[in-house]
């Protein structure tokens, strides 16, 4: 119950005191803000999309699991490619697929070459100490600094076909051979 109460406060911009009464249309406006909250309201359109996606969850989840498993199976042969999240995909549904490239290569150049071949990649995630809100000295995080220069996120979405996966893996490996 404490968690529910706290979540209700956070969803309403951190407003406390009589928050629940305001949602019951009793219009009590005696309130205070003691903590940071966010606007977690959802539009009807977002709710409709969410309901439709939930109906397809099993289908979409199994596609993501199968794609991640194919990537795992393909990349396990290569010592210079380390999968960041090898998992039991029966229990988890990955939302991203990250690789660490343990080979001297300019990751940003690699990404631009992949994009040139119509393979969009990402970098998940930028170290927190790079962000203004969490700014700190990177010398305290030497391993993070090394890994963040080698990490790349490959496409992982239910629309990928077997041919797409082959193209992604073969193109990546060909670029790494150069």
What are these regions (language model features)?
Residues 2-178:
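PLP-dependent aminotransferase class I/II
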């Amino acid at each position: 119950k404490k968690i529910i109460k706290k979540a209700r406060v956070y969803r309403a911009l951190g407003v406390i005191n009589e928050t629940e009464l305001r949602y019951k249309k009793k219009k009590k406006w005696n309130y205070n803000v003691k903590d940071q909250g966010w606007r977690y309201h959802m539009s009807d359109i977002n709710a409709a999309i969410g309901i439709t996606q939930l109906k397809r969850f099993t289908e979409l989840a199994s596609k993501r699991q199968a794609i991640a498993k194919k990537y795992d199976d393909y990349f396990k042969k290569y010592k210079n490619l380390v999968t960041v999240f090898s998992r039991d995909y029966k229990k988890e549904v990955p939302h991203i697929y990250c690789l660490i490239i343990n080979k001297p290569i300019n990751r940003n150049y690699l990404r631009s070459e992949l994009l040139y071949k119509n393979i969009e990649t990402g970098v998940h995630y930028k170290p927190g100490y790079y962000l203004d809100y969490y700014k700190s000295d990177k010398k305290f995080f030497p391993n993070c600094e090394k890994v963040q220069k080698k990490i790349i996120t490959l496409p992982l979405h239910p629309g990928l076909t077997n041919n797409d996966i082959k193209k992604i893996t073969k193109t990546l490996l060909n670029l790494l051979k150069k």
